[in-house]
């Protein structure tokens, strides 16, 4: 199947290859970010849903002297259920007190209004009190592990250690006092790593950035390594690289930031790379917010110049990734705004109630802007900013299947499920509706489930009924095809649930 480069893909008719046997959806929510479950789609479009930027963005700015003139998330945010507190680990610019970067700590009761408690654990003669909790640490992917019997390992960190030029693990009893756990690096690479605990798989997962030659250029790409015990890690496996479509669209992304680029283009050097990944393990798949770095030339200072943006990727096994949309999932700010130049993200997005929150770092400069380097006369820190903001999605609403007033249909591949009812995540216009038909594997409507009562309105959990009845227990474990008849409606996900 083909996906267009636009943020909305119109399908008059699509028939996809389907699994050889019924796909087991269990009782997990199924998204339409990929087409694994789509047998046929007629007169519908698949639309990328942009994260809604919080109106108070940027939420965290550089306002302490030991932070330097810019911030990046380059770390993680968790919600601590025990303390009823959001906790953030982020980085500042190198300063006289902390000359080679530092990881800092902030807290918030609501995830919006942030404090920087002076609980720093790194000694420096310049400041008696500060909020620096680790030196020379980048991408502090912090996990609170309540299952570990050892309280000294309550907090775990996967990170890049600048002094060792490698990826390492650390542990802490409180998230403030850190001890290096790994003696040798998990692997070598290039300063960016995403790490988190995957509850479904029971694995610690890390995506390190390691250079790899792709079409004649040594590029930033991503590999996968996992661990069952946080100490022994698998050999990294290459899982995510830019393709020809990425390179072909490089110039278009560069044109968006032309006014703030420091050097002219070199067509021989123009290319796309993947700078980092923010992950979100949804119920049935893993989403990645890929930091797409588009290079227009070598920079006057540092290595390469170019902008960054966030694009959505999806995988069901952590190894094979699809990127159906090649446009930003968090819109770039207008030139001059705080997030018009480059983007980075926390290591793992958060589910907060019925929303998904992604904290991201935004800058008003590009990767090769002279202000990033100690070049005389560059206006270092006087014109540009780097801050941290928040993008929000409603639960499971990352891609919508849209139908016009004349109607459209989406038919799934055969699935087997567990549960006693069907819930649909959908939104309709005033005159719109969603009707669900349940069929056998051959497409024949099942008795009693030929056409549901029309679904109208906006809900994350519309309960589907047929003649007022919702029970589907008799179909559990049997191959079933779902047919969604949509009119003036957006379909985001479906799930079979049980009480």
Predicted region positions:
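Bacterial N-terminal signal peptides
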Residues: 3-13
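Carbohydrate-active catalytic/glycan-binding domains of CAZyme proteins
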Residues: 17-499
């Amino acid at each position: 199947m083909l996906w267009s480069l636009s943020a909305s893909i119109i399908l008059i008719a699509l028939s996809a290859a389907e699994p050889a046997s019924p796909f087991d959806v269990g009782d997990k929510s199924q998204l339409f970010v990929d087409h694994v479950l789509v047998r046929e789609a007629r007169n519908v479009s698949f639309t990328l849903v942009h994260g809604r930027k919080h109106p108070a963005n940027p939420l965290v700015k550089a306002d302490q002297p030991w932070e330097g003139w810019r911030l990046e998330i380059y770390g993680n945010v968790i919600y601590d259920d025990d303390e009823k507190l959001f906790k953030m680990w982020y980085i500042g610019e190198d300063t006289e007190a902390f000359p080679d970067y530092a990881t800092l700590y902030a807290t918030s009761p609501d995830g919006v209004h942030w404090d920087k408690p002076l609980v720093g654990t790194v000694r420096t003669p310049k400041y008696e009190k500060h909020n620096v909790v680790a030196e020379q640490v980048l991408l502090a992917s912090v996990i609170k592990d309540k299952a570990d019997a050892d309280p000294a390992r309550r907090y775990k960190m996967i990170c890049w250690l600048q002094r060792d030029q490698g990826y390492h693990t650390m542990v802490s009893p409180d998230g403030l006092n850190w001890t290096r756990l790994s003696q040798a690096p998990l692997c070598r690479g290039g300063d960016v790593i995403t790490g988190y605990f995957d509850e479904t798989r029971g694995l610690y997962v890390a995506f390190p950035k390691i250079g790899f030659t792709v079409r004649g250029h040594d590029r930033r790409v991503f590999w996968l390594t996992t661990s069952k015990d946080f100490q022994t890690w698998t050999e990294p496996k290459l899982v995510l690289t830019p393709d020809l479509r990425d390179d072909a669209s490089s110039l278009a992304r560069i044109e968006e930031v032309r006014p703030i680029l420091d050097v002219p283009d070199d067509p021989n050097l123009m290319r796309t790379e993947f700078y980092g990944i923010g992950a979100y393990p949804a119920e049935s798949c893993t989403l990645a917010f890929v930091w797409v770095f588009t290079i227009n030339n070598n920079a006057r200072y540092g290595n390469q110049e170019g902008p960054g943006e966030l694009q959505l990727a999806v995988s069901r096994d952590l190894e094979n990734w699809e990127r159906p949309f090649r446009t930003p999932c968090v819109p770039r700010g207008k030139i001059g705004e705080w997030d018009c130049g480059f983007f980075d993200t926390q290591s793992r997005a958060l589910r907060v109630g019925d929303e998904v929150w992604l904290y991201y770092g935004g800058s008003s400069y590009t990767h090769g802007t002279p202000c990033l380097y100690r070049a005389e006369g560059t206006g270092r820190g006087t014109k540009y900013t780097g801050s941290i903001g928040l993008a929000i999605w409603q639960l499971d609403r990352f891609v919508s299947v849209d139908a016009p007033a004349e109607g459209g249909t989406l038919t799934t591949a055969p699935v087997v499920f567990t549960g006693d009812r069907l819930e649909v995540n959908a939104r309709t216009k005033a005159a719109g509706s969603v009707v669900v038909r349940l069929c056998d594997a051959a497409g024949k409507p099942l008795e009693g489930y030929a056409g549901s009562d029309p679904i109208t309105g906006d809900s994350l959990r519309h309960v589907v009924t047929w003649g007022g009845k919702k029970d589907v227990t008799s179909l559990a474990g049997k191959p079933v095809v779902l047919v969604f008849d949509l009119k003036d409606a957006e379909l985001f996900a479906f799930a079979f649930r049980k009480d």
